[in-house]
Amino acid sequence: MYRKDSIIIEEWLKRSDKALLVTGARQIGKTWLIREEIAKSGYRKFEVNFIDQPDLVDYLNVKMSANEFLVKLKMIMPEDCKPQETVVFFDEIQKCPEIVTKIKFLVEEGSFKYVMSGSLLGVELKGITSVPVGYLTVLTMYPMDFEEFMIANNVSKTTLEMLKAKFETCQPVDE
């Protein structure tokens, strides 16, 4: 399925030395899009979903140094998750906000790329200790726009271009 934000995630995977935070409403495709882009990139993915794996909230959402956190994280990773080859994906990050505080140090350490996603983050993350300014790229996703919806429904490029031209010139569309 085509989403315009896929280009942003693709570029982040290729070039960025920052973590990525993907926010937006529930059920708009954040998790799906992140998984898709990581799969296409050739990176391995280690995913932690803090709603599906609530025991990991208690394990990771405690005050500890970044080094201690990294050791704990590596303990739960499969052996095939190698440094420089793996993207660590924290999904539903609003359930484990302490990780956002540690991202600066994890990014500086450089073993892995980090992507986080969650819903209602503006409300849920108010209590974090420190926002990692300069170490985090934020992408706000929205529900599909009309063009994305049309592409998902296999509307041809020619038809899309015609509809766009009609819209821009305020002309009616033929039935």
Q: What spans do the regions from the language model cover?
A:
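Short glycine-rich substrate-engagement loop in P-loop NTPases that contacts/grips substrate
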Residues: 52-83
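Pre-Walker A adenine-sensing motif
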Residues: 1-15
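Structural recognition of the conserved hydrophobic beta-strand(s) that form the central parallel beta-sheet
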Residues: 113-119, 140
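Conserved P-loop NTPase "ATPase switch" module shared by AAA+ and STAND
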Residues: 81-98
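Conserved lysine of the Walker
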Residues: 30
